[in-house]
């Protein structure tokens, strides 16, 4: 079962968007290398004074390998936008029987007509 990884820092979401826009090739390269390490899904979110990354990975170890390998690329960007150390948490999906949405993240089961 895959895990959700959240990474939260205090920082400037607008500055992150600006840096991403100015460094699209670097961002795409990081994303591609993350996919090569097993990344399933990824988003950045921002709130007043906070930045959060929400990823889905096969397991925590896949993320950790990626994170360690990419510090030379991610670190300088984090230094420009973050005002705190990252808080990384791994979450497992709870089976509560009330799932709604997110079906678009994975292809439908073989033979399914669900879109």
Positions of the model-derived regions?
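Short S/T/G/P-rich N-terminal loop/turn motif that feeds into the first structured element of a domain
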Residues: 1-52, 56-72, 80-115
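Active-site phosphate/pyrophosphate- and oxyanion-stabilizing loops and adjacent acidic/basic residues
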Residues: 76
